[in-house]
Amino acid sequence: MFRNSYIQQNSDIQAAGGLVPMVVEQSARGERAYDIYSRLLKERVIFLVGPVEDYMANLICAQLLFLEAENPDKDIHLYINSPGGSVTAGMSIYDTMQFIKPNVSTTCIGQACSMGAFLLTAGAEGKRFCLPNSRVMIHQPLGGFQGQASDIEIHAKEILFIRERLNTLMAKHSGHTLEEIERDTNRDNFMSAEAARDYGLIDAVIDKRPA
């Protein structure tokens, strides 16, 4: 599995106590309780929080497909606070974002690093945002493998292919050349919200909802 190096230092971030707030709605039919994320899903809001891994990616893909079926013409809002994670899991989210009909607006809250930054940049053009104190970090993928020399060679070729593919897609979404992306992702490259906007990873920094 190919991952990013930053997540290894930040994988212990967990929701406080693992508690999820509940929201109670009242209607003519009575009361119904939702966890906060399910309630926000009704408003077409999806949260990508924590390390990107297969289980989380499957849930996000399912939510994207569900919201497309609900209304294929209304935007979906993806909020990202992630140190990054699995490349293959992240690419499943990316492909689903591009596959569905609704525009997916992305917003960074907190941090969007590595695969998190890649998914932030993959939002619909003109609809990619950061909150003012967000941090964005781009870099090349990290992979490790042990085994026979021939197997190591196979995996080395694979990670080079993945790096080129990620760089090509980031160049497409950011407006940079492939050479510029290769240079700027050679090492961990941290950016403020304003720097991410100037670089083309997002379209605007927002501090309040539009009136």
Curated annotation (Swiss-Prot):
UniProt key word Cytoplasm: yes
Catalytic activity: Hydrolysis of proteins to small peptides in the presence of ATP and magnesium. alpha-casein is the usual test substrate. In the absence of ATP, only oligopeptides shorter than five residues are hydrolyzed (such as succinyl-Leu-Tyr-|-NHMec, and Leu-Tyr-Leu-|-Tyr-Trp, in which cleavage of the -Tyr-|-Leu- and -Tyr-|-Trp bonds also occurs)
Protein name: ATP-dependent Clp protease proteolytic subunit
Family of this protein: Belongs to the peptidase S14 family.
HAMAP family (UniProt xref): ClpP
Record's keyword terms, sorted: Cytoplasm, Hydrolase, Protease, Serine protease
Subcellular location, record wording: Cytoplasm
The protein's role, per its UniProt record: Cleaves peptides in various proteins in a process that requires ATP hydrolysis. Has a chymotrypsin-like activity. Plays a major role in the degradation of misfolded proteins.
Entry's EC annotation: 3.4.21.92
Organism of origin: Pseudomonas fluorescens (strain SBW25)
An example molecular function term from Gene Ontology annotations: ATPase binding
Pfam families, sorted: CLP_protease
The gene coding this protein: clpP
